[in-house]
């Protein structure tokens, strides 16, 4: 937890941004896996963490801008709770740690909201992403699930604070990135032909645990790298395979790291793997070199895509003008996803608040296949923390689909592409902070080139 002054200042800035009304924060509850008392690992709502700092279940909070009140709602622990959980701080003690002096029982929240509604004042709330939040909004405001109308001023106020990382946040994110790097280095050290994917996943996840961290998202450790988010870990690693690892640590304060690496199963990459890998690295480095304030991230994405197309053209897999191929969307055969995303208290920071505000600054998103998956497109500014993760993927089903529809035949050499059906896919990912003059990698460096990876094997 940061000093209470941090949370006081954040709430003050948010009040000034929104201007009037009641700001409603719904904290997360415990969630049972298969019965009520056997719960998933608890994770507080990130905006609740950002403004209130308390990672406890069963809380809600309001900022009443018009009346100048900040209240945390929750129930004190009973003797039964203490028997099972031990002595805990009181709700009032927890609130004081984040600069809040007023607390009320959770049952009082509905009465407070009803009073505000009766006064014809605005109740601002955020997009619900959990069923429990939808039910609470229905109880508090009579809003049926699916009919929510989240407050745009509230969303924009939060985005305009959380997008810009402070020095104390950057230090916490860097810690997450350092642990994340150690996770990937461990995967490179332990991987052997004959292992199951889940053995590698277990080894790298143990590193996070050993550093007192959780995972920032479910680990990807797969020999089927053509599947972008593959959480299956049951394959046996064979000679000639590449293992794609996408994994990250989350600190006790909730800040995330997110890196990817692609590792040869044996001691060396094959010549064909190295050819594709080198193109990916070139696209990665081009994107990193372009990072600086004032640059639109969509332009960095386009640059990375052009480098990929140029490289694949050199191998005979693509043809024509790379810039035209990217403009028309032919690159998405090999790169059907985005280049990166914002990162902070969420690995995809504030994705629950809407990409249109977080990554696009209110501007519309493209509907083009591949480009529509770009989570970040806006102009870069100092304080932004983001990922760089271009990839090259050979997806047999997509190859067959586009070939049958004769898509982009001016740019894609389908005959040559057939020999790459079994290639799978690869990506590498690093985390960057936009500075006043450029960008700085966060966390310990992990191997990026084929030579660097092979040196770890």
Each model region followed by its residue ranges:
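Active-site neighborhoods and metal-handling regions in enzymes and metal-associated proteins
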Residues: 1-457
């Amino acid at each position: 937890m940061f000093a209470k002054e941090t949370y006081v200042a954040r709430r003050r800035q948010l009040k000034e941004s929104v201007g009037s009304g009641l700001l409603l924060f719904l904290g997360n509850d415990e969630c049972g896996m298969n019965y009520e008392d056997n719960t998933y690992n608890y994770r507080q709502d990130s905006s609740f963490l950002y403004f209130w700092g308390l990672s406890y279940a069963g809380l809600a909070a309001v900022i009443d801008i018009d009346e100048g009140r900040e209240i945390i709602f929750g129930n004190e622990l009973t003797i039964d709770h203490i028997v099972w959980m031990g002595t805990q701080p009181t709700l009032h003690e927890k609130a004081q740690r984040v600069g809040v002096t007023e607390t009320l029982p959770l049952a009082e929240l509905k009465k407070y909201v009803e009073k505000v509604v009766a006064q014809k004042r605005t109740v601002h709330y955020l997009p619900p992403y959990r069923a429990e939040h939808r039910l609470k909004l229905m109880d508090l405001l009579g809003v049926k699930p699916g009919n929510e109308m989240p407050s745009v001023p509230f969303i924009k106020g939060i985005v305009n604070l959380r997008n810009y990382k402070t020095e104390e946040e950057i230090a916490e994110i860097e810690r997450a990135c350092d642990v994340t790097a150690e996770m990937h280095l461990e995967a490179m050290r332990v991987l052997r032909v004959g292992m199951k994917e889940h053995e590698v996943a277990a080894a790298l996840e143990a590193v996070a645990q050993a550093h007192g961290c959780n995972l920032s998202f479910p680990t990807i450790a797969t020999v089927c790298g053509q599947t972008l988010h593959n959480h299956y870990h049951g394959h046996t690693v064979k000679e000639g395979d590449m293992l794609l690892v996408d994994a990250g640590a989350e600190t006790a304060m909730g800040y995330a790291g997110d890196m990817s690496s692609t590792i040869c199963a044996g001691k060396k990459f094959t010549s064909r793997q190295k050819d594709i890998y080198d193109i990916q690295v070139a696209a990665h480095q081009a994107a990193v070199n372009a990072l600086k304030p004032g640059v639109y991230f969509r332009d960095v994405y386009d640059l990375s895509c052009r480098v990929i197309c140029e490289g694949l053209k050199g191998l005979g897999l693509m043809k024509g003008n790379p810039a035209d191929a990217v403009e028309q969307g032919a690159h998405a055969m090999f790169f059907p996803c985005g280049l990166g995303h914002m990162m902070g208290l969420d690995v995809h920071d504030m994705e629950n608040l809407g990409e249109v505000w977080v990554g696009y600054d209110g501007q519309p998103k493209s509907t083009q296949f591949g480009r529509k998956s770009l989570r970040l497109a806006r102009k870069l500014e100092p304080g932004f923390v983001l990922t760089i993760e271009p990839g090259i993927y050979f997806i047999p089903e997509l190859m067959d689909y586009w070939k049958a529809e004769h898509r982009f035949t001016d740019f894609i050499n389908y005959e040559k592409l057939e020999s790459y059906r079994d290639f799978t896919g690869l990506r590498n990912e690093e985390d960057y902070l936009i500075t006043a003059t450029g960008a700085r990698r966060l966390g310990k460096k992990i191997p990026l080139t084929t030579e660097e990876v092979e040196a770890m094997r």
